[in-house]
């Protein structure tokens, strides 16, 4: 019997970086949690809260998932052993998960986008999203929907406030 997937967000997770533009530019279909292979100075830099997922994306090469364009600045106490800030980093997932993702990406014209980078139990994890790119009209519709929802909640707040006064 297969194990149930763990919830990605736990209360004891220390979030290092989030990719806020990903939710604006993509329709998120599914999320996955993956480990990441890092050097020691990268982990130390992440513990200082320094990272940027702004232009990051994941690719599948030879059955392995690689995170590209993740910017982790050099550790300021590091010496000649410091890492390259934008090097490609290998993501750690089970073979079945990788094969499943490859099939979905190939069939549905989808992409893998990192949503957040966080520590859980002393290990660095990446929340990956299987996503489809939004077009300009989709973004406008989402913005209009959010504005309408905000207006409804504002009006409800006014009515409740008027009843209690």
Curated annotation (Swiss-Prot):
GO cellular component entries: cytosol
InterPro entries: SmpB (IPR023620), SsrA-bd_prot (IPR000037), SsrA-bd_prot_CS (IPR020081)
Gene3D superfamilies to which the protein is assigned, alphabetical: 2.40.280.10
Localization, UniProt: Cytoplasm
Annotated region described as Disordered, given as residue ranges: 135-165
Compositional bias per record (Basic and acidic residues), positions renumbered to this chain: 135-158
Keyword Cytoplasm listed: yes
Chief localization: cytoplasm
Alphabetic keyword roster: Cytoplasm, RNA-binding
Domain of life (superkingdom): Bacteria
Protein task: Required for rescue of stalled ribosomes mediated by trans-translation. Binds to transfer-messenger RNA (tmRNA), required for stable association of tmRNA with ribosomes. tmRNA and SmpB together mimic tRNA shape, replacing the anticodon stem-loop with SmpB. tmRNA is encoded by the ssrA gene; the 2 termini fold to resemble tRNA(Ala) and it encodes a 'tag peptide', a short internal open reading frame. During trans-translation Ala-aminoacylated tmRNA acts like a tRNA, entering the A-site of stalled ribosomes, displacing the stalled mRNA.
Family: Belongs to the SmpB family.
Official protein name in the record: SsrA-binding protein
């Amino acid at each position: 019997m297969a194990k149930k997937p763990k919830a990605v967000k736990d209360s004891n997770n220390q979030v290092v970086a989030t990719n806020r533009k990903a939710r604006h530019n993509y329709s998120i279909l599914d999320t996955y949690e993956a480990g990441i292979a890092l050097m020691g100075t990268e982990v130390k830099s992440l513990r200082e809260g320094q990272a940027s997922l702004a232009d990051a994306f994941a690719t599948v090469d030879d059955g392995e998932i690689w995170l590209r364009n993740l910017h982790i600045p050099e550790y300021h106490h590091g010496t000649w052993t410091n890492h390259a800030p934008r090097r490609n980093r290998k993501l750690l997932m089970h073979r079945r998960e990788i094969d499943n993702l490859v099939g979905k990406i190939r069939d549905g014209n989808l992409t893998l986008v990192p949503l957040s980078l966080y520590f859980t139990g002393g290990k660095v994890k990446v929340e990956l999203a299987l996503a489809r790119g939004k077009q300009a009209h989709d973004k406008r519709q989402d913005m209009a929907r959010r504005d309408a929802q905000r207006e409804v909640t504002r009006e409800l707040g006014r009515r409740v406030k008027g009843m209690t006064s």
